[in-house]
From Swiss-Prot:
It comes from Chloroflexus aurantiacus (strain ATCC 29366 / DSM 635 / J-10-fl). GO terms for molecular function: nucleic acid binding. This is UPF0102 protein Caur_2698. Gene3D superfamilies: 3.40.1350.10. Signal peptide: none annotated. Belongs to the UPF0102 family. It comes from the Bacteria. Transmembrane segments: none annotated.
């Protein structure tokens, strides 16, 4: 049985995927895993691959939970995904963050930060 935190994460990921689809993105993968970690959502917007980190919280702004170490891990995971799928080096990609606020078991706020994480 999933923990309450895991259930909240699942609700957030489902809400984020539905939001992206409403915005015209195509979801390619959910919870893509490799030896170094997991990417919550992989989507396509036009000719660009979009790696999405989803953060769902009750009590704090979810964006505050993306540490420098997490950003570095996300970039490494993006490269792993590109390599694992034999995508050319010229593939356009970015990492977005979708921060969700939940209250009473419902998502009450979305904050979609496009290209939130860079290689710098």
């Amino acid at each position: 049985m999933p923990t309450p935190k895991r259930r909240l994460g699942e609700v957030g990921e489902q809400a984020a995927a539905a939001y992206l689809e409403r915005c015209g993105y195509t979801i390619i993968a959910r919870n893509w895993r490799c030896r170094d970690g997991e990417i919550d959502l992989v989507a396509r917007e036009g000719d660009q691959i979009v790696f999405v980190e989803v953060r769902t919280r009750h009590d704090q702004h979810a964006l505050e939970t993306i540490t420098l170490a997490k950003q570095q891990r996300l970039v490494a995971l993006a490269y792993h995904y590109l390599s694992a799928h034999d995508l050319p080096a010229t593939t356009r990609w970015r990492i977005d963050v979708i921060a969700l606020t939940a209250r009473g078991g419902r998502i009450v706020d979305y904050d979609h930060v496009i290209a939130a994480v860079g290689e710098d």
